[in-house]
């Protein structure tokens, strides 16, 4: 899969689009095929190293998004493959897929546009 990657704290123009390993859901986690991701002011600060939270590099920015569940880990009870969800995570939404806790994903109607969710 591909993701936008921050390799060093720098302007957003230094972000790169590159191949990374597909995420694998662990217990209580789901993998979401990302259809839309929100861009927030903190994302701009984080990639420049100006935010109080600074993840280890390299990382994919993006706090939130929506998509379709493509796999579930052991003990997942709240979501199933094929569910449309909105999700929140500290970073990682600027990718084709993301793994999130099932508790941080919320069902949305399949008829609801992902870019609005």
Residue spans for each PLM region:
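Glycine-rich beta-strand-centered segment in the early N-terminal region that forms part
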Residues: 21-38, 50-92, 99, 111
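Extreme N-terminal starter segment of soluble prokaryotic enzymes
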Residues: 1-2
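Short hydrophobic "strand-cap" motifs at the C-terminus of beta-strands
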Residues: 6
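Structured surface patches comprising rigid loops and adjacent beta-strands/short helices at the edges
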Residues: 99-107
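Cytochrome P450 core scaffold surrounding the K-helix E-X-X-R motif
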Residues: 42-48
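A glycine-rich, Thr/Ser-enriched phosphate-binding loop motif common to dinucleotide/cofactor-binding enzymes
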Residues: 112-117
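A local structural motif
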Residues: 12-19
């Amino acid at each position: 899969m591909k993701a936008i990657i921050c390799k060093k704290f720098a302007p957003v123009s230094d972000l790169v689009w590159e191949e990374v390993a597909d995420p694998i859901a662990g217990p209580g986690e789901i993998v979401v095929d990302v259809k839309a991701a929100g861009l927030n002011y903190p994302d701009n600060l984080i990639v420049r190293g100006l935010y109080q939270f600074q993840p280890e590099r390299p990382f994919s920015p993006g706090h939130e998004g929506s998509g379709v569940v493509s796999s579930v880990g052991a003990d997942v009870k709240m979501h199933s493959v094929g569910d449309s969800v909105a999700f929140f995570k500290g970073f990682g939404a600027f990718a084709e897929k993301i793994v999130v806790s099932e508790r941080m994903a919320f069902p949305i109607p399949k008829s609801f546009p992902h870019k609005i969710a």
